[in-house]
Structures are given as structure tokens and as C-alpha cells.
Amino acid sequence: RLVEVVQHIVVRRTDCGTIRGISVNTRNGMMPEIILIQTLIGRVVAENIYIGSRCIVVRNQDIGIGLINRFITFQTQPIFIRTPFTCRNTSWICRLCYGRSPIHGDLVELGEAVGIIAGQSIGEPGTQLTLRTFHTGGVFTGGTAEYVRAPSNGKIKLNEDLVHPTRTRHGYPAFICNIDLYVTIESDDIIHNVIIPPKSFLLVQNDQYVKSEQVIAEIRAGTYTFNLKERVRKHIYSDSEGEMHWSTDVYHASEFMYSNVHILPKTSHLWILSGKSCRSNTIHFLLRKDQDQITMDSLSNGKTNISNLLERNDQVKHKLFRFNTFGTKEKGISDYSIFNEIICTDHSYPAIFHDTFYFLAKRRRNRFLIPFPFQSIQERKNERMSPSGVSIEIPINGIFHRNSIFAYFDDPQYRRHSSGITKYRTIGIHSIFQKEDFIEYRGIKELKPKSQIQVDRFFFIPEEVHILPKSSSLMVRNNSLVGIGTPITFNIRSRVGGLVRLDKKKKKIELKIFSGNIHFPGEMDKISRHSAILIPPGTVKKKKCNKSKKIKNWIYVQWIATTKKKYFVLVRPVILYEIPDSNNFVKLFPQDLFQEKDNLELKVVNYILYGNGKSIRGISDTRIQLVRTCLVFNWDDGKNSSSIEEAPASFIEVRTNGLIEYFLRIDLVKSNTSYIRKRNEPSGFGLIGDNKSDRINPFFSIHSKGKIQQSLSQNHGTIRMLLNRNKECRSWIILSSSNCFQMRPFNNEKSHNGIKKDPIISINNNGPLGIALQVANFYSLYHLITHNQISIIKNLQLDKLTEIFQVIKYYLMDENDKICKPDLYSNIILNPFHLNWFFLHHFYCEKTFTRISLGQFICENICIAQMKNRPHLKLKSGQVIIVQMDSVIIRSANPYLATPGATIHGHYGEILSQGDILVTFIYEKSRSGDITQGLPKVEQILEIRSIDSISMNLEKRIDAWNECITKIIGIPWGFLIGAELTIAQSRISLVNKIQKVYRSQGVHIHNRHIEIIVRQITSKVLVSEDGMSNIFLPGELIGLLRAERTGRALEEAICYRALLLGVTKTSLNTQSFISEASFQETARVLAKAALRGRIDWLKGLKENVVLGGMIPVGTGFKRIMHRSRSRQHNKITRKKKLFEVEIRNLLFHHRKLLDFANFKEFM
């Protein structure tokens, strides 16, 4: 095959005139000296070589060993040499591009069949090496690595904090240390200390028993002696079915667009959370929602008839009312009870439910989230206000009613620095907002009216007010006139000028200064005494003198009586405030509400904060807010709008890569206490206590008297919807109690391992998606057990702390490791901004090793607590979904260790089946240097077969690179340079890969032999459809040089794509159909040539041998060239037409072929 593809390559010219070359760097370290000598020896220089300003080698000079030594000595600039890649001839090669002959030390002679020599030079060593391997049995090539071995039998002791898990270069689990690690091996009679150097692999674990001379570590400080290695891909498959989660150490964004491959920057764990996956069709998906409860057997049984459904309903009711009423400590039922939800299920989708399968409970999804940009807790601990000035008002009990004020905004244009009087007309009064229903966020108490008054415009009459003690010595008198800066007392001066009015009371003196103009009315002026009126702008006429006065603005006329008979009128200025219907409050409040239904109504209303005619008194330099813009919250629940009157609120804090976002979640649900039993009924089932919390956190179960135990058997589960890119086929996962286990670290029962499997586990509303705590009833300590994400407005006082701590003897420890010992006789203030609260039992727990928080992932056999006279408590691997007073409920999960450079298949939260590929490792594997492994790779390269996997995004990368090149150098040259660089780089890469195999066996083949082969398999391009061309058809396979010359001659851009053909395909795509037919597929090639009318010009060796003619090499080549040169000279001297010259330059090789055909006819 090698000879077949290059049999027509013959040296037919001395110089092709090319100015291109390949760069070779002669500096130290860039290339080994032996390889450099083999690369340069026998080559021809493409450009002059200078040392400073002196030229040491001229162009087209061949390189010998003397010149190479000078290059290495002087370390010149990169040398450009001519190679078969740079030759401009299409079907043959010139002497200067080939170089010296391998037979003698001069340039190769004309007519030498260098193609045949190249094929033999590559194929013969491979055959000899293969025969040697078959006879000798192969050659072993390996290396050594430095290991640390155990000096004796014993148990390993080390500091686990100084190591972290990783994998060796072979893909096996290990530990790595960054500093010197001291390892102790304890045996019965002696203790050995071993020092492990940094960056070494530790192959054993703590407390592991090792034998003498066992390898415990591999030192990585030195260099490896493994010279021959290969990269191997190792896939890790999921052992169980479930949901995939990972930490922030994994890039959540995919490596490429539209792919599910994620890159791991550092060592991390992947988790498969247990759960049963199911596929849902379109009809079932309309019924199944997130957090719904369903029976597991319905998944296998399919449809259920009505009779079975009724029986199961009775069974559920029997289960519901069969409670232990003898005072046993039980867990409480959650907000979404079986009884309540069955009632709701019967009213919705009755026919469809009976025809499909049985729902145990239906989760209400009538809620929404409201994001608001809080500032950091450290900056503003006493105030919760966003930078935009919008404040959120939450009722104390955490329950919103209809038409409640949800948020407010104080517009700066309605703020005043001075005191005054407000006057307005009333549009509407809303008296349902009481003052005691609100929490003040600003740290100071603000006076609020009992009702909110809505107006369209109002008037503000400014005045200066001073409240002075009765013992103050005044420097002004009543009804006197003062100017600006007039002393009132020794340390108070007036800020405005006007009339002074004094009002003396029992313990204080109220001093007011009214600014304005004084008017003395006549006897006939009919102005009602002892009254104050507002006069609009316009013209005022006097009846006595028939004079009129024009008023531009509103004025406030006030009657002032000095004595019983003397009086005057004070005309005071008025400031008019217009309240527009629309404002920018909605723009300040975030509009991206995550609501599940379009039932939220937010209405913007402006309320005035002070009564009509009421005097407003400013304190020192504080500003007075006259109007408050409020956001009134309401909802519409369709048919059942009258049934839902309360909406409990809860705060959610979401942390992502250190960023904290706060959300307020409002659930439009109805309390289930009304139709379970009467609240004050002493007997019964006691679902909700009388004076206890009516709203239970969905992540906890409260232990108290009268509570019942909500149990879920093995065949019950909770649905969790999963994100799926395919909308037509959505998937969901069932989380049942069989996927969880319960551990009770603080109970009095004795257990060997501290782990107790409890199939009776309530998992209502459990899941690792977030933590939501109710705002109401914070006095209950059950809300402070876990990693609390509580975001409330200010420090909260626990009113019932004494009663709780008399029963529960625990200490509180916050995130700063401060232990709060409760005082039974005083209330304790807990700072909710410390979000990590932990309970330490004062009797049982001596030392805590691992803190357990909600949502935390725990590996297997991690000790969480040490008990007195008891073994360590260890957990199974999983995720903590419930943290209770005396137990921890963990969802089973399998961890997988992944090292840097690994690729993860699948998205975060995606469901995986058992046996799916989870992660792919790329590690090194030592291999032997046998030629039996090398030759197949050479054959794969020359036949262009895929060795390694190709990137999924390779085509998009090339397109993006071409766009950048086009922007830099312009459109006409973008395609040319892109294809040229692609072909040139591919040729160099193929030569290096083939040489690597032969050099590993000590076989030295000159690069030009391989370059001739590679030149032929990369000499074809495929005409693309990107550009319109009238010369070649789209999809046509043509030569690269022919495409370039045709485009330059016709000044037309020809779009083509670089193409790699194997030696077999290249041999079947030549200009000689005789050569193709004698190689493979004889009948097909001859039939196709006949249909196309192909002409064979007989320019190669093989076709002349087949037909019995003279081959164009050696002496036969000299005779052909002598005839053709003489005929060519006569033609050119006889006809000097420009068109004929252009055509001959265009079809340069065809001119030679015509001459050769004429010569054959002459013979």
C-alpha cells in the first residue's frame, strides 16, 4: 500500500521556485541533538541564514554535517528548510525540495523514483521488526518507582487532617499529603515512625493493619523512569439508582454548549442520592406534582379500579385514626396530613384519579417566592432595608391576611425638615391595619394612626415649633414679630421670621412661629372670626373699595385675636403636594416573582401618615415623612378564594458559591386544625396542641404530649420532579422511607454501632432543595436545632424559654463556638444572625467531632459524637434531611471520589439509572515498547483511522477560529490561510507520530520518506458549498495545488475543506484509472472510468508496467525529457500568444503530459 500511493513520485525538475519552508529551531532544549541532526542532514535551505549581518548560508544550499555543527554552536535563529511539503509540483517533486540522495552525498538525480524508495524505507523496517518480535517473543520495556514499605506488622496512625483523597496515575484511590507526613506503625512491642515526603501518594488508611514490607506510600518527588506511557480512559459506573449531586468544586456550567460534560477542577465527591426513578407520560404528568405522596405498589400494578380505591381509602382512614393515646412520645404530623389531603384529592380530578392509581397525599403548590436585595448582615444588623429603600413588613405572628400591607417605600419628595399642619380631603379610609400588628425595623418607634387614609392631594402649612420647659426664660412675647435668627432663649434662635404664639401648659411651654403676611380687615370684610380657611389661587375682590387682588398660589388665612376687640388676619403660605396615581414604586420592588400561579395581586396605594388638621412636630434635625407608598398584598384562589384567609410567611436563604440571596416565601394554604378536631377538646386524637405551634416546620417533627406519630410504611413515597431537557418525556423520582435511615445518638438505649434502622420515618416535604423556616412561633426551640437559615428583622426574645429548658436540658452553641447556658429565671436573647445553632446535651455528650447540619453530606464511618462509656457513634453515607432533638434522619447516598481532570457525565440533579456512566478518569498506563503495539498505530495513522476520541465541539471550535482569522486579515484570505494552516499542522503531527514509533525501536528513518507518504494522503481537498464556483462542483475531490492555482488564475475564490485520506483511498483517487484498477476494485474502477470517459496519461510507473511501456524513470526519463524540451522550445519561439502562455501556466502538468503523449505516438 505504501508503494502504491507514491509509485508515480519521480524527480522531474531541479527547482520548482517555491519560497516556502518549514521552521526548525536549533536552540538548546528545543529538540534533541540526534533528532536535530537527522532532521537537517541532506536538506536544502529555503532562506539565507545570517549571524548578525554576516550571511553564512545562502538559499538553495544543501546542509551537511559541518553546517549543522555550526548551527548548534552559534545557536542561530530558526532555520527554514525545503521539504516535499513545500514543493509546488503536483504529481512529482523537484531536486531541491527533496535534498540529497540517500545513496550518495549529492543532490538527487533527475528521474529518480523517490516515491518507491520512500515506500520501501518505511515498510521494510516494520517487516523486520515484526519478524524479530515473532521470533524473540517481544521486548520488555518498563521502569522503577520509589516506594515506602512498612518495617513491621502493625496498625497505621496518622493525622487525617494533613491528607486529602485523590487517585494515583493508574486510577486507584489513595491519599496525598502536601507537607511532610509522620506515620506511626504501632505493633505489640515497638513503635516505628516513618516520614512521608510531600506530594507523595499514601496507599493506606488510618487505623489500617499492615504487614511487614507492605507498600504504604509512593514517593513522587523524583522523576519517573517510565518513558513509555499512554493515556487510558476509565469509566466509573453508578452502583445504584438515584439523583446526582455534587459540591461547588465542580463547574456547574458544561464544558461545551449543548453537552452534559462537566470538568472537575480539584478533588471532590460526587453523590448519588437514593430514590426510585420513574418515567411519566403526558397524562400522568398533569396529575403528579412535586412533593406529592404516592403508593409504591401503584407503580407496578398500574391502574386501580374504584372498589380497590375505596378499600384503600378506608385503610388509610383506619391508619389515620388508629393512634396511641396512652401518652407515648410520638412525632407530630406535618402540615400536609393524609386526612386533609385525601379530602382535597376527592374534590379534584375525581374521575381521572380513580382510573389511574392511588395518591396517598396531594401536595399543595400554591406559593410564591419574592426576592429582595438585603444588605450584608454585618453592615446592618438592626435594619432590614434594601438599597432601593423598599422595606418589607412582616406581621409578628408571621401570617398575612387579605389586603395586608406587604412593603412600603418612603418617597424623599414627601419629607419635610420643619413642623407644620396637614390639610386634605379624604378619598378612602382603611381601618384594618392596626399599629400593634407590625414590627418596627428601624430601631425607633414611630407614631402611626389607627387607620390608613388615602388621599389624592394635600396641603402643608409650615411653622416652627419649640417645646420648652416651663422654667425657661423667654426673650420674646406672645403675638410679637421676630426675624430670622432672633434669640428666643439663651441657646435657641428662630429659623424663620413671623408671628410668635405662646401656649403655656402645666409643665411646658409650646412656642410657635407663623410665617406670612399680616392683614387688618375692615369693618365690612366678612371673614368669620376664630376660623382658618384655605383660599385657592384667583382674584379676591373687596366690596368697600371695589378693589381686587390677584392670588397666584394657595394661601391659608388664619384669624388672630390679640384682645377681645383687636384682631387681625395672618395670611400664611401653603405647600401643595400632588399624589399621582402611578409612581415608580413598582420599579423599585423586584418584579421577578417566582410564583406557581397567577393569583398574586400587588396594588400600589399612597397613604398619608397624619390626620387632617393635625399639627406635626419635628424633633431636632429629623425629617418628617408625610406620605408613605405602600404595596397592598392580596391573592385570588379561584373558587376557594373565601376559604383561604391566611398566608403564612417564611424566609429562605440560598447560598451559592459564597453568594447569599434572600427570598420571602408565602404559602397560600389553609390550616388543617379546624376539621381534625375541636381546639379545646380534651380527648380525641390531639393532632395539634392547645397552646403549641399550629404551623409546623416541614423539616421537623415536634415531640410533645398529645402529638401523634405520622408513619410512612415501605410502600409509601414522596414524588420529586426532576429537571429534564426533554419536555415530552419528563421524569420524577420517588423518595420513600426505604431510602432513609435514622440514627439516635442521644437516646438511652444501648446499641453497638449507634445506628438504628427505623422504617417508620416521616419524610413529608423532605428534600435537599432548600431550608424554609416559618416566621411565626420562633420561641419554639425546635426551629433552632439545625443549620438555621433564619433571616428575621432584629433580635428575637424567647418568651417561653424557662418552660422549655425545664424539660429539655440542652446547651446552645452558636457558630462562633460560644456556649449559651440558659438561665431559668431570665429570658435569653438569641441572635438569629448567627445562623448555625447546635445543641449539646449536658449529660451524655462529652465531645463533638462532627457538626451535623441540614443538607450536609456525610461519608461512611464518620464519628459524630463520643459518649460516656459507649463506643463512638458513626453514620452511614448520605445526606442529612432531618435533624431532631434525639435523632438524625439521613437519606442514603453513595459517594464517588473524583480527581482533577475527570469529566462528569450528567447535569446537577439529573436522575441516573444503575449502570449509567457517572465519571470518566484519564490516567497513565505504562506500556511496553514492543513494535507489535507500535505498528498497528502506524497503520491507523496512515489509513486515517480514529485513535483517540474526538471532541464533540471540534467543528464549532474550527468555525470560531475561522471567524477570528477572517476578521483579522479579511474575507478573501480567511479560507486560504485557515485551510493552509490546518493542512500544514496536520502533516507535521502525522510525521511526528510515525517517527515516535520507529525511534522507540532504534530504527532511524529520514523524515523526507515519511513526508512523501503524508504529502500524498493530504494532497486532496473537498470543494465546499460555502461559495459559488463555476469551475468545480460541490463535493468534488481535487488537488490542493490545483485549487489554489485555479483560484489565482481566474481571480475567483474557491471554497474548499481540508481532507485526510488514507493510503488506500488515496491510491483509488489518482489520475490513472489503470493504476487504480490494478490495485483494488478492478471491475468498479474500470466501469466508472468508461462511463466518465476518463483518459489515462500514463505518467506513473505502474500503468506503464501494466501496459508494457517504458517507465518514466532513469534512462527512460532522460529520453522523454530531451524530446519534450526541444519541442517545448520550438513551440514557445514559434507562437508567442498571450492566451496560450496563460493556459500553459495554468495547466502546467498537463503540458508535460501532452508532450509525453506525443512522444508515445512518435514512438
UniProtKB/Swiss-Prot annotation:
InterPro entries: RNA_pol_beta''_euk, RNA_pol_Rpb1_5
UniProt keyword annotation of rRNA-binding present: no
Molecular functions per Gene Ontology: DNA binding; DNA-directed RNA polymerase activity; metal ion binding
Keyword annotations: Chloroplast, DNA-directed RNA polymerase, Metal-binding, Nucleotidyltransferase, Plastid, Transcription, Transferase, Zinc
UniProt family annotation: Belongs to the RNA polymerase beta' chain family. RpoC2 subfamily.
Stored SUPFAM superfamilies: beta and beta-prime subunits of DNA dependent RNA-polymerase
GO biological process, one term: DNA-templated transcription
GO cellular component, one term: DNA-directed RNA polymerase complex
Enzyme Commission number, as recorded: 2.7.7.6
Keyword Chloroplast: yes
Gene: rpoC2
Subunit and interaction comment: In plastids the minimal PEP RNA polymerase catalytic core is composed of four subunits: alpha, beta, beta', and beta''. When a (nuclear-encoded) sigma factor is associated with the core the holoenzyme is formed, which can initiate transcription.
Name of the featured protein: DNA-directed RNA polymerase subunit beta''
